[in-house]
Amino acid sequence: MSIFLCFLLLLPLSLILFKKLLPSKGKLPPGPIGLPIIGNLHQLGKLLYKSFHKISQEYGPVVLLRLGVVPVIVVSSKEGAEEVLKTHDLETCTRPKTAATGLFTYNFKDIGFAPFGDDWREMRKITTLELFSVKKLKSFRYIREEESELLVKKISKSVDETQNSSVDLRKVLFSFTASIICRLAFGQNFHQCDFVDMEKVEELVLESEANLGTFAFADFFPGGWLIDRISGQHSRVNKAFYKLTNFYKHVIDDHLKTGQPQDHSDIVSVMLDMINKPTKADSFKVTYDHLKGVMSDIFLAGVNGGANTMIWTLTELSRHPRVMKKLQEEIRAMLGPNKERITEEDLEKVEYLKLVMVETFRLHPPAPLLLPRLTMSDIKIQGYNIPKNTMIQINTYAIGRDPKYWKQPGEFIPERFLDSPIDYKGQHFELLPFGAGRRICPGMATGITMVELGLLNLLYFFDWSLPNGMTIEDIDMEEDEGFAIAKKVPLVLIQTSHRW
């Protein structure tokens, strides 16, 4: 049976649901006219946030699209985002379900994609207490500092071995963030772990995230699962999922080995105790699926998100020599010459680095589209009626580049945040790299500290330049597809140890 024939068989049911989901009254947001059955799917490219941005430029900051039989509201303004994430936070703080997210979160047993409710509250409480609290952030400081030292030693070694050597920063920084995340969350030191190959871990994260971000026919059409199976989509996603699950199995088995040394008491150990030694006071039962769901959130978001942010920051600095020079001069002036080791206390001394980070988040947010929300009741956004069970997407990429909020929005100008109250912590809705409200990213502080410390080391100890014959205009800024904004073409720079 062909895919086309399957699609024809599903048409009658799709038409019925399409009409049922079509709101019959009230002022709805504007949007492009869709085709029968598929709606607006044909108007979307591989980079959804750019497709949404283009549509919003024509139809306005609040747009109604229909993806198959699924109504979707795209919000591309500060004002609309504030209404969704603050005014109507409680009515919109659950998540829609897709085939891929259900699979990679072990039936929504995680934090990021879990529906709003008691289970989500309990899981967030556990992870906040055991991983993301201020106390835990401070206790994991030694891990971040040790891995930063190793990063510097690794690059210094390559400089000593080959003059004017170049470095593929994607590989180096991916290894850096993966090592930190896995040590603080899983208690696994990749440098001493016999079942981990860093090359395979990188492949695992990228493949998992790519499949996690894919849409299936089942997400938009009743009975679409049949087309997913015939097309091979179901098989591809499951193959990636099984690889990820096998990695988690190794981590869990390693924890269950008697006498196996760990860096510290990590969240895997804590949740294993909850699973194997539940107390009578525990009304919420933690399962292995909860454990693996949380591992997915931390591993996929933490590793790739952190590496991407560091790469985009160094890319923008390479494209703007004035900013690079100013930042390195401030860092070296504030930290002093010939410093052997950088600590997290040094982060408080470099104000311009923080401005550079905020500007990077504006142009290259870790999630160009915040994780989708689902309305739990009828609400109004910017005067438009938004029915219950409607998916809402906040386009942070579009908001961060809107000339209504930013002068010269396409330019990388960290000074725009000098003496500005705007930050990235969810209180200023023109800048939302980590979201806002009840579903704000709980690992924000951990991720920021890791990224800033890594960059501080790279910019203090090394001078960076483009490979011979390459100019600023040659730097490729193309973005790759997926949940996160990744640089498609690796950033390769020449590093030299700084001489005082």
From Swiss-Prot:
Ligand binding (heme): 441
GO cellular component: membrane
Database matches in Pfam families: p450 (PF00067)
Recorded family membership: Belongs to the cytochrome P450 family.
Main location: membrane
Originating organism: Arabidopsis thaliana
PROSITE patterns: CYTOCHROME_P450
Protein EC: 1.14.-.-
Record-linked CDD domains: CYP71-like
Cofactor entry: heme
Membrane-topology descriptor: Single-pass membrane protein
Protein's name in the database: Cytochrome P450 71B38
Segments crossing the lipid bilayer: 3-23
Matches recorded under Gene3D superfamilies: Cytochrome P450
Keywords: Heme, Iron, Membrane, Metal-binding, Monooxygenase, Oxidoreductase, Transmembrane, Transmembrane helix
Listed GO MF terms: heme binding; iron ion binding; monooxygenase activity; oxidoreductase activity, acting on paired donors, with incorporation or reduction of molecular oxygen
Keyword Transmembrane helix: yes
Keyword Transcription regulation assigned: no
Subcellular location(s) per record: Membrane
